[in-house]
Amino acid sequence: MEGAEAGARATFGAWDYGVFATMLLVSTGIGLWVGLARGGQRSADDFFTGGRQLAAVPVGLSLAASFMSAVQVLGVPAEAARYGLKFLWMCAGQLLNSLLTAFLFLPIFYRLGLTSTYQYLELRFSRAVRLCGTLQYLVATMLYTGIVIYAPALILNQVTGLDIWASLLSTGIICTLYTTVGGMKAVVWTDVFQVVVMLVGFWVILARGVILLGGPRNVLSLAQNHSRINLMDFDPDPRSRYTFWTFIVGGTLVWLSMYGVNQAQVQRYVACHTEGKAKLALLVNQLGLFLIVASAACCGIVMFVYYKDCDPLLTGRISAPDQYMPLLVLDIFEDLPGVPGLFLACAYSGTLSTASTSINAMAAVTVEDLIKPRMPGLAPRKLVFISKGLSFIYGSACLTVAALSSLLGGGVLQGSFTVMGVISGPLLGAFTLGMLLPACNTPGVLSGLAAGLAVSLWVAVGATLYPPGEQTMGVLPTSAAGCTNDSVLLGPPGATNASNGIPSSGMDTGRPALADTFYAISYLYYGALGTLTTMLCGALISYLTGPTKRSSLGPGLLWWDLARQTASVAPKEDTATLEESLVKGPEDIPAVTKKPPGLKPGAETHPLYLGHDVETNL
């Protein structure tokens, strides 16, 4: 189909803005009502973890929403349209991530009763390692959140004329408001609403597109004829942007760095009432991720079929692949006022969920890692006040970063995954070393973090300066042959492939040799590269500088010790006796909310240490 002519610019109408405003108001109302119910938050633990009494289903949906931002709402359909349905293998990588998180990381974090994941790094290594982890997390999250807030605002502005500052300020202020007032409970329950909005938005687009294109059989047939049904791509070349191996290896490790050790996600599943419910939340999260990614990828296939003979990127109607989705919505719903506003609500629901999650998590890390160790005597009410103030500050900071994000290039999906992969990949390596390698010591993990960050940053910067050609990445061909003459305005002469401005490898004779090899690897491998470099370097330096003796490590810090203990923390109820606690298993014991300031991981005689040898199946 041709769609509108290139010179015409569709815009959102009053009904669309009304639907969008309704979504913002409902999100605000849910956040404020949940946050202020029952007297609000009485302690920092209430603010950051909901008192560790949250149910599995809302937490699971919140986990799914946290990284399914507007970046994914706009980016995944565009990538599926250009590279094919093989993007569905992302779901397999997410499944492996959920299983590894539930099996490896969740039991350790939950039984230690931590609010900040980086507390583990101090218990296992030293305060210096904890501070390094905290700072890396804050930098990564600030940059990621800035991209999440700014990129969709820019894209929608370019396609529809939606005022960029109005969208930035409305979403940023509302998100900061309910996160500051309501804390974790507000974030979780608004996420639930926003997941529903995202899914409904995708399904409405799918239904309308399939009907206009003659039914699902016709859509699949046309997609198959144009090589978009390509699930059986097992090319091992790491330079191919998306293959089975890219998602299974690179994708799994990127998602594991987000779910296994990322503060924003760990903070949610340790907020569940029991360890069993935390694992159930991960399963619910997996279902939510599958529905969102599969729906977005299928929208991408419908989008390709709709524009198969008149690619708007070739005609100049849009200037970047990320603009496909809003253009499609305006084209197929031009006679249905208000429905495009549902897509706008869908995109910004993702933005709100991610931004609120990040703000709450950054405030938690700052309180637990930077403030409480220096001011251990602060009263609970003062900590709540400080926590809310930090949420407001971080919300304002994210808006500032968003305003400075105009230099973003390479697509919003690639930009967001690059930030998380480069910085969070080495952190995943550090946590994995701590939990699996007893010999790893402080010099080793610090050296590994530095090496992993340097290598992953090196390849990311190299790929930015010398981007690979579309043939190397595996971009599938598109066409403008079916366009009317007056709609082909800005496409490059003789073009047969959609282009996002990335030069082919043969155009620049000054490109270094690494440009078409090392720098050309898929961005999904950046995190894996950082993780593996951190682990290899950390293990080597640890053995060279004197490995840590396993006997010197306290209980609950190594994954290998999980089978020999039921819990490493006391139950939440202060009235429970030691004998009552000992008969409870990990499924029944909630994470502890308070630990004496002097508790050390090796203090096995301390009343709060309940580890003992038992037979358990984990």
From Swiss-Prot:
Recorded catalytic reaction(s): these are: iodide(out) + 2 Na(+)(out) = iodide(in) + 2 Na(+)(in); chlorate(out) + 2 Na(+)(out) = chlorate(in) + 2 Na(+)(in); thiocyanate(out) + 2 Na(+)(out) = thiocyanate(in) + 2 Na(+)(in); nitrate(out) + 2 Na(+)(out) = nitrate(in) + 2 Na(+)(in)
A single BP term in Gene Ontology: iodide transmembrane transport
Which residues make up the binding site for iodide? 76, 90, 255, 413, 417
Residues involved in Na(+) 1 binding? 69, 71-72, 144
Region feature Disordered, mapped onto this chain:
587-618
Q: Which residues are modified by glycosylation?
A: 485, 497
> What GO CC terms are in its UniProt record?
cytoplasm; nucleus; plasma membrane
Coiled-coil annotation reads none
Q: Which residues carry this modification: Phosphoserine?
A: 551
* Entry's transmembrane regions: 15-31, 57-80, 85-105, 131-157, 164-181, 190-208, 244-266, 279-301, 336-363, 387-408, 412-437, 442-465, 521-545
Subcellular location(s): the record lists: Cell membrane; Cytoplasm
GO MF annotations, alphabetized = iodide transmembrane transporter activity; monoatomic anion:sodium symporter activity; protein homodimerization activity; sodium:iodide symporter activity; symporter activity
What's known about how it's activated or inhibited? Perchlorate inhibits iodide transport activity. Oxyanions inhibit iodide transport activity by blocking the binding sites for iodide and one of the sodium ions.
InterPro entries from the entry? Answer: Na/Glc_symporter_sf, Na/solute_symporter, Na/solute_symporter_CS, SLC5A5, Sodium:Solute_Symporter_SSF
| Topological type in the membrane | Multi-pass membrane protein
The residue ranges for the Cytoplasmic side of the membrane come to: 32-56, 106-130, 182-189, 267-278, 364-386, 438-441, 546-618
Q: Which keywords fit this entry according to its UniProt record?
A: Cell membrane, Cytoplasm, Glycoprotein, Ion transport, Membrane, Metal-binding, Phosphoprotein, Sodium, Sodium transport, Symport, Transmembrane, Transmembrane helix, Transport
Q: What is the effect of changing residue 225 to Q?
A: No effect on sodium and iodide transport activity
| Binding-site residues, Na(+) 2 | 72, 144, 258, 416-417
As for what it does, the entry says: Sodium:iodide symporter that mediates the transport of iodide into the thyroid gland. Can also mediate the transport of chlorate, thiocynate, nitrate and selenocynate.
Q: How does it assemble?
A: Monomer.
Family designation: Belongs to the sodium:solute symporter (SSF) (TC 2.A.21) family.
Which NCBIfam families does its entry note? sss
Q: Which PANTHER family match?
A: SODIUM-COUPLED MONOCARBOXYLATE TRANSPORTER (PTHR42985), SODIUM_IODIDE COTRANSPORTER (PTHR42985:SF11)
Name of the featured protein: Sodium/iodide cotransporter
Task: Tell me which species this is from.
Answer: Rattus norvegicus (Rat)
